[in-house]
């Protein structure tokens, strides 16, 4: 699930969603950035790179999604990435992985 909005609100909402899933006994993963990585409370938190580093985000996305599969997480939450050059391709891949579920905050 993608969560879009102002960074502090996104972090807070993802942490709420993580707690809800964990209370149900589910393992949860979060795709974060270097800037927000330490602010999450999920079972598996992975930084995709610096928010402004489009190349790193694109390079790490598939690897991170495979890692979550390997870890058998039940739910994945991700920050949204609006980057001008390759951002649309990144967002299209994330939207597909999220089953087009987007939560605006």
Could you tell me what each predicted segment is?
Residues 1-99:
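A C-terminal functional module that forms or caps the active site or interfaces directly
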Residues 102-105:
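Short, flexible loop segments at boundaries between secondary-structure elements
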């Amino acid at each position: 699930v993608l969560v879009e909005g102002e960074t502090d609100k996104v972090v807070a909402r993802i942490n709420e969603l993580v707690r809800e899933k964990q209370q149900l006994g589910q393992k949860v993963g979060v795709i974060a950035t270097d800037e927000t990585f330490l602010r999450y409370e999920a079972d598996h938190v992975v930084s995709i790179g610096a928010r402004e580093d489009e190349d790193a985000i694109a390079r790490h996305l598939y690897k991170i999604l495979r890692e979550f599969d390997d870890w058998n997480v039940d739910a994945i939450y991700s920050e949204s990435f609006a980057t001008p050059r390759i951002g649309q391709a990144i967002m299209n891949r994330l939207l597909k992985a999220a089953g087009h579920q987007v939560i605006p905050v």
